[in-house]
Amino acid sequence: MKFLIIQKIKREVPIEKWAKMLPLQFKYFENLEKEKTLEVYYHLIGQQGSMLIVNVDSDEKLSKIVGQDPMFFDSEREIYPLTTRQTHEKQIRELLQPEPAGF
């Protein structure tokens, strides 16, 4: 299952700490890319944050990815489950189908 993770560094994090932790986070993301867990990474310009799309098979794996991030305690994040347009369209079509008579 794919998840969108938007994470931003907390404003109160001292720049010195941020400067030390950022290379560790880059290395962490690089490893996730090699594992094919991290599909997409973008820096959020002007936001001191990033946007990731991860592909995992369990909530345990998602929790591990988030919890092992070197910037875990210094970031705030939002996590959203994703689905394809085709899956979404199929679900909507099923919802909009009229129920058979007699129900």
Residue ranges and their predicted role:
Residues 1-103:
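Conserved, structured core segments of small domains
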